[in-house]
Amino acid sequence: MWSQIPGTLMRTSSLPAVIEASGNDDWKKRKEAQSLKRLEVKKKRIERRNSLTCNTSKEAAGQSPEEMNANTDKLVSSDETIASANESHSSGKHLVKGLPPKYQATITSQDSSSAMRKKPNSAFKGTAITEEQNSSSSVPSSGEAISSVTAPSLPALSLVPITATLGSREDQSILGRAGARANGMGDVERRMMQEMPGVFTKGLSNGSRVEGFLYKYSKGEVRIVCICHGSFLTPSEFVEHAGAGKVDNPLRHIVVSATPNL
């Protein structure tokens, strides 16, 4: 049969109470040791910071006001030299902008050589000035270099079709002045002028005669270039340019000549 269960249970699996108390003591000791180490580390950091601040304050206090002013003047002068160097460098870039690489190299070398020529004694001033004039005359200016690079090597009258599409009188007058310089043109330009028929006004009320060149376009638009001003005009404007005013049919007063007007 079943035996009676005693009223109190005995501990069988857990550690004795003495061992548990000793384990708690060890854990407390470890915690205390860790906290002490942390405090020591914090103290060392604070001491280092204090020592650094003390050293910097001592150095600042040891300097006289004159030394401090001298240091500030050195810093300001160095900043000014850097700023002036940057400005001169940027201005040199703007001056050389738009030139081909070979002209850029010559101009930069000229600038450096001219800066070195300013240093010799007064005995060599005459030779330095003559050398500088010779070098400056050999190197083209920025405007001449730009015009020589950008100016096309096409005939003067090859710009005429471009002006017909522009429509503004200002551009037409600018290119018309280029066409007025046809006196010094070469054989190619003269051949082109011979292929273009010449025109002149006839039968006007004032009896004036104005000569020009006739140009035809694919859209049927007609433009006439007057010889006197080099302007690109329509038939009605060409008749008005002759001083006859507005007419009903301007083509009746314009005659195409067989020989070119050269």
UniProtKB/Swiss-Prot annotation:
Name of one Pfam family that matches: NLS_NINJA_AFP
InterPro entries: Ninja_fam, NLS_NINJA_AFP-like, TDBD
Keywords: Nucleus
Region (Disordered): 48-69
Annotated TM spans: none
Location(s) in or outside the cell: Nucleus
Chief place where the protein resides: nucleus
One example of a Gene Ontology biological process annotation: negative regulation of DNA-templated transcription
Gene Ontology cellular component terms for the protein in this record: nucleus
Origin: domain of life: Eukaryota
Stated family: Belongs to the Ninja family.
The protein's name in its UniProt record: Ninja-family protein 3
